[in-house]
């Protein structure tokens, strides 16, 4: 059953992505989670698709961000525990590396990347609000591999145990819908603004329709040909190229050639 547009919250992918399109809110959330400042955001892509090659499993990032210093941040909202987050994080990080290191470049040119999963449940099971993972030497815990990667899993269920006050209020808002801080009130205001936007409503309706059809036809695991057929139909109905790209995951250049 598709959730009504009026009932969407930050937990829902569609609304989360809409809110994260705001660079200020997106930057502040990342900094809050990492407890560190990041550079100026120069690129935000919502529902960003990466296809390494035709037969490979594709990746769709909720929010992919790049800052002026070249660092990448993937931010995911996760409400269902599919018990695969550690392996997904590994795959997502590899997809970023493969996609953004051009042929002929040196490995040292790989940009730092951060994979962040904001979960409404405890994915690790240790009752901690924040789990941060880096590669370290098992024989000498003080020695880091320094490969420029970091993975962070947030457990919103443990918001009461969160030491960072701002993060605690955000996680409480995520779980309860109660906006008590200036930051969460800004998020809630933006959500209400989105709900008043007729174009956003139509976009959600369209995406929901295609996703239901995709499940029925097996399109979620779908073939390249299915994606092309969907793109062709959408073009015939004069849908925007950017929306076709978002739904099918096909590159813009391929869509234009169809």
Q: Model segments located where?
A:
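Accessory alpha/beta interaction modules
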Residues: 1-150, 160-162
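Generic structural signal for hydrophobic core residues of well-folded globular domains
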Residues: 19, 33, 157, 174-177, ...
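Compact structured core domains
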Residues: 148-173
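Short alpha-helix boundary/capping motifs
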Residues: 44-45, 58, 154, 198, ...
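Short, charged alpha-helical interaction segments and adjacent helix-coil junctions
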Residues: 2-6, 10, 14, 66, ...
């Amino acid at each position: 059953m598709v959730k009504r547009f009026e009932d969407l919250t930050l937990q829902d992918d569609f609304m989360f992505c809409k809110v994260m399109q705001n660079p200020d809110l997106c930057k502040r959330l990342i900094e809050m989670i990492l407890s560190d400042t990041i550079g100026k955001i120069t690129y935000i892509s919502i529902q960003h698709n990466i296809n390494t090659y035709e037969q490979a499993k594709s990746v769709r990032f909720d929010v992919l961000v790049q800052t002026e210093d070249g660092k990448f941040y993937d931010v995911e909202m996760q409400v269902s525990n599919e018990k695969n987050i550690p392996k997904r994080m590994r795959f997502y990080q590899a997809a970023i590396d493969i996609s953004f290191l051009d042929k002929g470049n040196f490995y040292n040119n790989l940009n730092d990347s951060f994979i962040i999963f904001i979960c409404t449940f405890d994915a690790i099971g240790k009752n901690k609000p924040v789990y941060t993972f880096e590669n370290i030497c098992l024989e000498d815990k003080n020695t880091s591999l320094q490969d420029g990667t970091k993975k962070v899993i947030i457990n919103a269920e443990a918001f009461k145990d969160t030491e960072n006050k701002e993060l605690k209020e955000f996680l409480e808002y995520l779980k309860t819908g109660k906006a008590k801080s200036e930051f969460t009130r800004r998020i809630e205001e933006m959500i209400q603004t989105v709900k008043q936007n007729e174009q956003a409503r139509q976009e959600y309706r369209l995406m929901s329709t295609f996703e239901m059809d995709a499940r029925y036809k097996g399109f979620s695991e779908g073939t390249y040909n299915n994606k092309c057929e969907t793109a062709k139909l959408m073009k015939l109905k004069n849908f925007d190229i950017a929306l076709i790209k978002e739904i099918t995951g096909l590159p813009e250049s391929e869509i234009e050639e169809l």
